[in-house]
């Protein structure tokens, strides 16, 4: 089992991993989105954090699932001209999940606050996906887009040698067997040879020697 002490603090808070110690304030098991968020928040509060991962690379399921999050009525929706409200979300969740009302209300009350905190205290940046319907678009309270947020691509070379520690996306999300692409690149790649704009976009992707995730 591999472990990285304060790994999230290094990447997100600009700190270097601390030496292994005998005691920690917070121990996080798993390096997916939930684990990394927990570690980053604890580190931002000056807690000594140990992040433990059983795999040889970090990222968990999040790394192979696109890294998107579902945050209803988020403050970023206005960037793409969309609007939402918690009452509509509440109706949608009441028709789709069987979780307790208490947990649902906690999610509704704090999910947007959570992403605000992460963007303020870490280098994570998210953007709304305008056309990404809820899984059950015909149910009451569903929307056709905006609730899903995706991470803004960044230059993977900033991680240096630690880039190799990241779990790779699925092959379907990579070009030429190893070049990572974003969701917005896919329509352009499908139109190569049919659209000058898309062809130029694809050529820039290939010519770009940066690693991006």
Region roles according to the model:
Residues 2-8, 15, 54-213:
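Conserved N-terminal/central alpha/beta ligand/cofactor-binding core
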Residues 18-20, 48, 134:
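Generic low-complexity segments that are intrinsically disordered, proline-rich and/or Lys/Arg-biased
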